UniProtKB/Swiss-Prot annotation:
Name assigned to this protein: tRNA pseudouridine synthase A
Enzymatic reactions: uridine(38/39/40) in tRNA = pseudouridine(38/39/40) in tRNA
NCBIfam families from the UniProt entry: hisT_truA (TIGR00071)
Family of the protein in this entry: Belongs to the tRNA pseudouridine synthase TruA family.
Superkingdom assignment: Bacteria
SUPFAM superfamilies listed in its UniProt record: Pseudouridine synthase
An example molecular function term from Gene Ontology annotations: RNA binding
Name of the top EC class for this enzyme: isomerase
Function: Formation of pseudouridine at positions 38, 39 and 40 in the anticodon stem and loop of transfer RNAs.
Length: 258
């Protein structure tokens, strides 16, 4: 068997998430269906580095899969790309070692979250940015977001009832930019891993700080108390993008560890 690694992007609007599940359209199911056609009708299982939720998008999701024989990687990419549905794009395919695992090999993820703060909202962005109709002071959020950087126990920012025992993660970079021409806030988080709904909960909390309904110090309070009830609401999934995944063997990996 030959193992392949692929970078994919997708519009999550019409998907019930990445991971295969019964009676739902998922990214995994669509790619596996296409690979089956390219593999003489034989099943191919793909593995994903991130299990994005319903409505969540990706520019830089990474998958891996095995095929019984070596293929020209560009022909394989082209075949997959042209036969997958229009809301999935196969960006790159490369052959990798048999022990490569897209989820368990050491890597760094970057997520982006888009928030439309226009009043009225932009209907063209309804599937691609979460609308926040209340006034915000961007400088308050930019100050508060600094407290998320570093190694912390993020229990207070994960979904209640999660089965993951170790909730310590490291965020290397966290920032907020404002694209005035589109009334868009762009939240960017880079870290060694993220808990279930962590990014959406951090954004929901920061928006509440920006609106003046929580103090700037609330991030520190939540991290210390490890209490989800102290955080803001979970922001909707339509604004979330898995932007990039960088593995340890890639040249730019060390830039984030400094």
């Amino acid at each position: 068997m030959t193992r392949y690694k692929a970078q994919i992007s997708y519009d999550g609007s019409a998907f019930s998430g990445f991971q295969r599940q019964p009676n739902c359209r998922t990214v995994q199911e669509e790619i596996e269906r296409t690979l089956k056609r390219l593999n003489s009708g034989n099943d191919v299982i793909i593995h994903g580095a991130g299990r994005t939720d319903v409505g969540v998008h990706a520019y830089g999701q990474v998958i891996h899969f095995d095929l019984p024989q070596a293929r020209d990687v560009e022909k394989l990419r082209f075949g997959l790309d042209t036969q997958c549905p229009d809301d999935i794009d196969i960006v790159k395919v490369e052959q990798v070692s048999d022990d490569f695992h897209c989820r368990y090999d050491k890597h760094i993820k970057t997520y982006e979250f888009l928030v439309d703060i226009g009043r009225p909202k932009n209907p063209m962005m309804r599937n691609y940015a979460t609308h926040y109709p209340y006034p915000v002071i961007i400088e308050l959020m930019q100050e508060a977001i600094k407290d998320l950087v570093g190694t912390h126990d993020f229990t207070g920012f994960t979904a209640s009832g999660t089965s993951v025992e170790n909730k310590v993660r490291t965020i290397f970079d966290a920032k907020i930019q404002f694209e005035a021409s589109k009334n868009l806030l762009i939240f960017t988080f880079t870290g060694n891993g993220f808990l279930y709904k962590q990014v959406r909960n951090m954004v929901g909390t920061l928006l509440k700080i920006g609106n003046g309904r929580m103090p700037i110090s609330q991030i520190k309070t939540i991290l210390q108390a490890k209490n989800r009830d102290l955080a803001g609401p979970t922001a909707a999934g339509n604004g979330l993008y898995l932007k990039e995944i960088i593995y340890e063997d890639e040249e730019c990996f060390s830039n984030f560890r400094k």
